């Protein structure tokens, strides 16, 4: 995949041909969802945020827009779209949802469902000052290059975990966010 440019049609056909495997039984019962926004361009981008340094949890970390499901959300997809609107002003109607990835258990006790959606290139992002300190775009082909992610094995709360680490410009991409991007790369058939 690194040998040639990845265009949006290639990404969409590969994503739709390779459906996520059914997920294992969830360790966590509290539900959350994140939007994995792919920017519609000839060479698509992946939209990411950097969380505010003032937040109690995951302060300053690179993340996808998203959060906990609340009682106004009819579905996990609705939760991801609501959170994306609250955090970076992406209107729900501007997102073309193309699917979901297998849920991921977070260290904070949530089962997080990544919702993959295509967004227009001309959206004007407006970061919520309470939650987001930066919004940036990474070329999708670069984000999906498996060789950019490095494993770190840790022992936490009595369990062994593997987390993935990477840099993009001055942003440190790691943990769940790097794991979701890596899962997306594997989903479309990227090879290490």
Curated annotation (Swiss-Prot):
Purpose of the protein: Probably mediates the hydrolysis of some nucleoside diphosphate derivatives.
Motif extent (Nudix box): 67-89
Gene3D superfamilies: Nucleoside Triphosphate Pyrophosphohydrolase (3.90.79.10)
EC class name: hydrolase
Residues annotated as binding Mg(2+): 83, 87
Residue stretches making up the Nudix hydrolase domain: 29-160
Pfam families: NUDIX (PF00293)
Organism lineage string: Bacteria, Pseudomonadati, Pseudomonadota, Gammaproteobacteria, Enterobacterales
PANTHER family registered for this protein in UniProt: MITOCHONDRIAL COENZYME A DIPHOSPHATASE NUDT8, NUDIX HYDROLASE
EC number, UniProt record: 3.6.1.-
HAMAP family the record matches: Nudix_NudL
Species of the source: Klebsiella pneumoniae subsp. pneumoniae (strain ATCC 700721 / MGH 78578)
Gene Ontology terms, MF aspect: coenzyme A diphosphatase activity; magnesium ion binding; manganese ion binding
Top-level taxon in the UniProt lineage: Bacteria
Protein family per UniProt: Belongs to the Nudix hydrolase family. PCD1 subfamily.
Example GO BP: nucleoside diphosphate metabolic process
Listed name of the protein: Uncharacterized Nudix hydrolase NudL
Transmembrane segments: none
Keyword terms: Hydrolase, Magnesium, Manganese, Metal-binding
Keyword Lyase attributed: no
The protein's required cofactors: Mn(2+); Mg(2+)
